Amino acid sequence: AAALSAGKLDLLDGEFLAWHLSGGTSELLHVKCGADGLPDCTCIGGTTDLAAGQLLDRAGNLLGLPFPSGGALDALALTAEPEKGFKPKVSDCKFSLSGMQNQVENKFKTAEPKQMARFALETVANAVIKATEQAREQYHCPILCAGGVMASQIIRARMNKRFGGEVS
């Protein structure tokens, strides 16, 4: 479905990395065309606890934003100054977001709402980019992104800046 909505059905004939980032899951898959012509998917990374969308919804809740909070959080964050975000530990394409949640909650105590929103989104982007970089050490193929979290202009821009035309 993600390949269809991105207009990238041609990816199904080869090999690619696929992120599904939402409130329910945050998984990085390696996908290749199987011998039977159907996609063969292997989960190679993602979160070990909290889904990316859960983290963003919790940040939005702290700010009093409507649920789900992704769109409103992104709009607020776009009004903020650029922010580096928290640099998570990523190992074998896997990372924990619960520690990032603590960082976001600490930022809430000390920063303006728009800066806290930006911090949360940049933190998720940092984790996703680092995991993707690790995956690309083994799999040199295009990247397909799906799920509500990838609707974020900030996260998508960061992915496109880092991986260029390789991201759909």
Question: Which role fits each region the language model picked out?
Answer:
Residues A1, T47, G164-V167:
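Short, acidic/small-residue loops that bind anionic groups at enzyme active sites
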